[in-house]
Design a protein with these regions (language model features):
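Surface-exposed patches in structured soluble domains
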Residues: 35, 49, 53-56, 62-68, ...
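Short coil-to-beta-strand transition motifs
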Residues: 26-31, 139-140, 195-204
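A short, hydrophobic beta-strand micro-motif
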Residues: 20, 165-168, 188-198, 225, ...
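N-terminal beta-strand block that forms a small beta-sandwich/beta-barrel module immediately after a flexible targeting
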Residues: 17-49, 208-209, 240-242
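Alpha-helical coiled-coil segments
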Residues: 76-131, 149-152, 174, 218
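Sec-dependent signal peptide recognition
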Residues: 1-9
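Structural microfeature recognizing short secondary-structure transition sites
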Residues: 116, 147-148, 202-246
């Protein structure tokens, strides 16, 4: 009986060694799903109640930083700025006259102080009008591509109405979820490979940062990375798999 038991254990050893090897291999290459996202993306919304004069970009078209994305009809705002400037000029001249009269002891210091305050108020009105007018042209905060056009030319919009969505497709990052038990191996700068489904290619990437917390339910943490290879064919929204070695 004892011999039979020893024989059974010896016979099972190759299977145990094989199972351990498979387990070790699985731990060495942990398959994870990854998604490619744009680091910079935003929804452009209206900051004023106005009619759109210019909205020439279409979905998929490129733009450069500082380029006008949307322009509004701001004839009223321009007129208000001109009026504010004229009022400031009048207030400034009045203040100058008051100062001369004070030097001649012809008026009181109170009248001079009032004239100075009126000039300051007029100057503030000019600044307000300039700030309002600056919202008439929405400039691109970065270079990139249009992903959705919501508004239409000559449409009248209100404050907060969405106009278009944009992103920087040249600044991409990889995002995936990793088990928190492997946190020690997820060092910033660690290299890994990502195979993208849409292109059928494999790219070299590296970890750039980790999420700020571990999900207590799934026991996972967000990991972010960047592709170090030339990857002009990648677009936000593509996905793939990575094999991250511990």
């Amino acid at each position: 009986m004892t011999r039979l038991l020893i024989f059974s254990v010896i016979a099972a050893l190759p299977l145990l060694v094989q199972a351990e090897a498979v387990s070790s291999e699985m731990e060495t290459n942990i398959p994870l799903r990854a998604q490619i996202k744009a680091k910079e993306s935003t929804l452009i919304a209206s900051e004023m109640n106005a009619r759109i004069n210019q909205l020439k970009l279409h979905d998929g078209e490129r733009f450069t930083e500082g380029q006008t994305l949307v322009a509004f009809n701001c004839s009223l705002e321009e007129a208000q700025l001109n009026k504010a400037k004229a009022t400031l000029e009048k207030a400034s001249k009045n203040y100058e006259v008051k100062q001369r009269l004070e030097a001649l002891k012809s008026i009181s210091a109170l009248e001079v102080a009032v004239a100075k305050a009126e000039e300051g108020e007029a100057r503030a009105d000019v600044q307000i009008a300039q700030a309002v007018l600056s919202r008439c042209n929405i400039k691109a905060p970065f270079s990139g591509k249009v992903t959705d056009v919501i508004a239409k030319p000559y449409q009248t919009v209100k404050i907060g109405d969405p106009l278009l969505e944009i992103l920087n497709d040249k600044s991409l990052e990889i995002e995936f979820m990793a088990e928190s038990k492997n946190l020690a191996s997820l060092a910033v700068g660690k290299k890994f490979q990502v195979s993208v489904n849409e292109t059928g290619k494999t790219y070299t990437a590296e970890i750039t940062r980790l999420g700020g917390k571990v999900d207590p339910v799934s026991q996972t943490i967000k990991v972010y990375g960047r592709i170090t290879d030339k990857a002009d064919d990648l677009l936000p929204g593509m996905s793939g798999a990575i094999a991250l070695k511990p």
